[in-house]
From Swiss-Prot:
Highest taxon in the source lineage: Viruses
Primary location recorded for the protein, binned into one broad class: virion
Location in or out of the cell: Virion; Virion tegument; Host cytoplasm; Host Golgi apparatus
InterPro entries: Herpes_UL7 (IPR002600)
Protein keywords: Host cytoplasm, Host Golgi apparatus, Virion, Virion tegument
Family recorded in the similarity comment: Belongs to the herpesviridae cytoplasmic envelopment protein 1 family.
Region described as Disordered: 1-55
Protein name, UniProt field: Cytoplasmic envelopment protein 1
UniProt gene name: UL7
Function: Plays a critical role in cytoplasmic virus egress. Participates in the final step of tegumentation and envelope acquisition within the host cytoplasm.
One GO cellular component term noted in the UniProt record for this chain: host cell Golgi apparatus
Ranges of Basic and acidic residues composition bias in the record: 23-32
Compositional bias segments (type: Polar residues): 1-18
Amino acid sequence: MSVESSSAPGSVPTTSTVRKPRPGRETTREKSGTSPIEACVEAAPRANVSSGSGARTMANWAKETCDAVCHGGGARRRTPLERISEADEDAEECGNSANLPTRYEFANMLARGMPTAELVRAVVAHVIPRFFFEIRTAPGMPVVFAADSVSAILVGRDGSEMELELVSGTSMTMEDYFDAYLEMDNHLGFVFSVLTGAEDRVGSVALTWTELIDRMYVIQPNTSVDFSLCVLCMYLENVAEEDVTLSHCVMLKAALDKLKRKITFHAKVAALLANGCEWLLNTLMAMHDLPAFDRELILPHYGVAKPLMSVESEGLEELIRGLYDTHTITVINMPEPGHSDVQIMLEARKSTLNRVYENGNYYSRVLRLWWNTPLKRKNAYAMYHVYK
């Protein structure tokens, strides 16, 4: 699947907010200091949560914590927790237990004496990186956002070796692919978006186009672990449906577990990427009627949509499109391509977890707007700000 924007050609803007690592800089990490999450833990109120006022104070703090997680602690307009969470009293009856807790559930958990750190971990677990693309440029050509670069991943018996089959027909190890990426000046890394589980609505997202652009990040991996996790996420989102077998998923899980054991406490971005891999792998298995490794890590809207999609009914198809594929609200006031805009091309393989790419030209339009707004190209390693 290839989608090209309708904008006019132009020169490629420079990416001033990120800098590609060079060989020998594998030890470089994201900025040191306290993350928004840790800062919120330290700032947690010490009120008596058994009282009504104490519970409300703690609930307000939890709301700020969730906002800090979803917006990186920045000063941008915050998304209310009510908008982030889809959970309600009927969530468990709908099999939607993976939704982010509401602010009232936060208060209840705190009133029951739930440790602050445990509560924060519960929030963070629902923050997921999605929609991975490799970014490639060439003089006088559209910027290519390729999600289908890797057509297959073969995993060694112990999960330590990953052999990649590229769309070009070439085979190489993950380490060789990482080395090649470091040497290619036209490979600008990856782009991904940060969502919560409830915001991923199968064929659409529960965000306006302006909010989605604010959630996009460039990552130019500076370690082989980060690079491997980006490739693995991208592959899970674009895997050929006939390749989704139990044995293949077991081997991918072994590779993921091997990578997770290399993640240190301070490697916050790597932990985010690994968490995304877990959600994607378990959701993919559930959508293909395979036993998921952890049913709590199935994206909630997919869990509800799966049985509906299996029923063949013309009336039901219209309902599913209305529930999961509509962008009517999210595209309000989206500008048309400018004459000086750089053209972009989106390349992806039709797969279970990337239905949003097939939904008209919505995602390619968002990518074009994001790429042609250089100040929006935020460095993923800067998500964790320094608190003084």
